[in-house]
């Protein structure tokens, strides 16, 4: 799985390595969240595979919605306002945070607005990947304009 891939990369290269999926699990665990809502850009089978991955880390998904983007190109072309509106819908469920996987979906500039509208932490693939990379490099977060995770809150 993901942990074996990261370990193989680390051993082969001799440098820290990570993955977006593991970054989601690490961020959720560090922040103490147990129940999350998910808005996945993927088709349903891929969205359900992400939920199964989270379950391996004892993370409960209280609500799952998907946008049926057939490819990364389609994710990248999605209207940001549509994504925000769907995140707001997911936030109406009993979750500690909202997750938006898929690094092809350009969400980093949307995170703060999503959190403002939902009143909840929103963890996106790009944000957790950047958060993990900063930590692996020995840095710390505290960046404004990119949501609570990268803001260090």
Summary of predicted features, one role per range:
Residues 1-153:
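Non-catalytic structural scaffold of enzyme domains
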């Amino acid at each position: 799985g993901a942990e074996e891939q990261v370990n193989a990369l680390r051993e082969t290269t001799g440098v820290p390595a990570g993955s977006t999926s593991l970054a989601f699990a690490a961020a959720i665990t560090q922040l103490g969240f147990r129940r999350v809502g998910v808005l996945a850009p993927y088709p349903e089978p891929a969205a359900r595979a992400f939920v199964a991955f989270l379950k391996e880390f004892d993370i409960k998904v209280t609500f799952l919605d998907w946008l049926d983007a057939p490819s990364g190109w389609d994710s990248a072309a999605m209207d940001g306002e549509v994504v925000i509106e769907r995140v707001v819908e997911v936030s109406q469920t009993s979750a500690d945070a909202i997750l938006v996987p898929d690094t092809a979906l350009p969400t980093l500039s949307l995170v703060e607005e999503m959190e403002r509208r939902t009143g909840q932490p929103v963890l996106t693939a790009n944000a957790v990947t950047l958060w993990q990379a900063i930590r692996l490099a020995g840095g710390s977060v505290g960046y404004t304009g990119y949501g609570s995770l990268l803001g260090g809150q």
